[in-house]
Amino acid sequence: MYKEPFQPTYEYALECDKHDELKDFQTEFYKKEGTIYLDGNSLGLLSKRAEKSLLTLLDSWKEYGIDGWTEGEHPWFFLSEKLGELTAPLIGALPEESIVTGSTTTNIHQVIATFYEPKGIRTKILADELTFPSDIYALQSQIRLKGLDPDEHLVRVKSRDGRTLSEDDIIQAMTDDIALILLPSVLYRSGQILDMKRLTAEAHERGIHIGFDLCHSIGSIPHHFKEWDVDFAIWCNYKYLNAGPGGVAGLYVNKKHFNRLPGLSGWFSSRKDKQFDMEHTLTAADHAGAYQIGTPHILSTAPLIGSLEIFKDAGIERLREKSLHITRYMLNLIDHELKDFGFAIGNPLEDEKRGGHIYLEHAEAARICKALKANGVIPDFRAPNGVRLAPVALYNTYEEVWQSVMILKKIMKDEEYKQFENKREVVA
């Protein structure tokens, strides 16, 4: 599929683009002329299909008013379940195990409220010190709601190098006092993929429920939840899945737990045929829809309709194949062109451990990111010293990767970054 072996030339980049089986999808996206967008791991670009589905849902409001809940091309009342079914193949789940609902953080609160049942000596939640802050805030909050002290009952696995986690260390931390585990599938800084299959098996061997935050993996790597028997998962849809800023998130619950009442119940937790009976006793849905809380945010959900059509056409296996190749290409090019400028590669080099973005460490990272933006390359800064670059399989080209590395080389060689302050903006 892709030209080998690596060559650091512009011509090689063009050859790779020529052989790219996914190249036709680039025209599906709005790409600003003169800009190389390498921040799809924070916010994916708008596609024409996502735009169309948003406008379609707006038109249904205009056309049907209240009847839009049951009329039109995409009736709102069933939309969350429909999109959950379309998302299920991306995580290797059954259609009824996936639901599009809430936000990442509200969904964390939901699954923790549902699965965290401290009793006896099992009172602690296991997480890690490198996870995204919102996960920790939610876990601390849920522990306090149980009348417990987060300082004592939230265990965070330490990193040996400040970048990655050892699965052996995580397993060693699965002690008899652990009631629940929440871990990232892919670390948001270093892009390390955790071995979800192994960790799930080890947790279950010890009688512990385990779930994963998929924000940096869904739409980028394949998942096999049915095979792995993961208990629950949550994710956002606005990164690799291109659902737009504030796009509605997703939630997975293993079907073996469908008899478990949601920790946070609401009107849309109800079975559809019972919802408008207006009873004060909840008859929960017999699928992942039970873990919805409130009325779905229809207009924030709409772009995902078109976006998931693209993923169905492209196929997650093909997307992963290109992602691995284009990130490997970028790593090779960085090593070839930037080795004299003080950069350290912070993400794993092994294919099976590397997610969809590159993580460079540099003491001047914040001002380097500003210089890149000034030169038309959109990166992502992560404190304290990280530059994240995400060549997304659906819409980035090898030519863009080559150009961005050459721009970065010029910035470093000419010390252009020194004209900027070495501190982050309000939104990094």
Curated annotation (Swiss-Prot):
Keyword annotations from UniProtKB, A to Z: Hydrolase, Pyridine nucleotide biosynthesis, Pyridoxal phosphate
Cofactor: pyridoxal 5'-phosphate
Superkingdom of the source species: Bacteria
Functional summary from the UniProt entry: Catalyzes the cleavage of L-kynurenine (L-Kyn) and L-3-hydroxykynurenine (L-3OHKyn) into anthranilic acid (AA) and 3-hydroxyanthranilic acid (3-OHAA), respectively.
The reaction(s) this protein catalyses: L-kynurenine + H2O = anthranilate + L-alanine + H(+); 3-hydroxy-L-kynurenine + H2O = 3-hydroxyanthranilate + L-alanine + H(+)
Any one GO BP annotation for this protein: anthranilate metabolic process
Pathway(s) it belongs to: Amino-acid degradation; L-kynurenine degradation; L-alanine and anthranilate from L-kynurenine: step 1/1; Cofactor biosynthesis; NAD(+) biosynthesis; quinolinate from L-kynurenine: step 2/3
Protein's name in the database: Kynureninase
Alphabetized Pfam families for the sequence: KYNU_C (PF22580)
Gene: kynU
Quaternary structure note: Homodimer.
Modification sites for N6-(pyridoxal phosphate)lysine: 239
A cellular component annotation (GO) from this entry: cytoplasm
Binding site for pyridoxal 5'-phosphate: 104-105, 132-135, 213, 216, 238, 267, 295
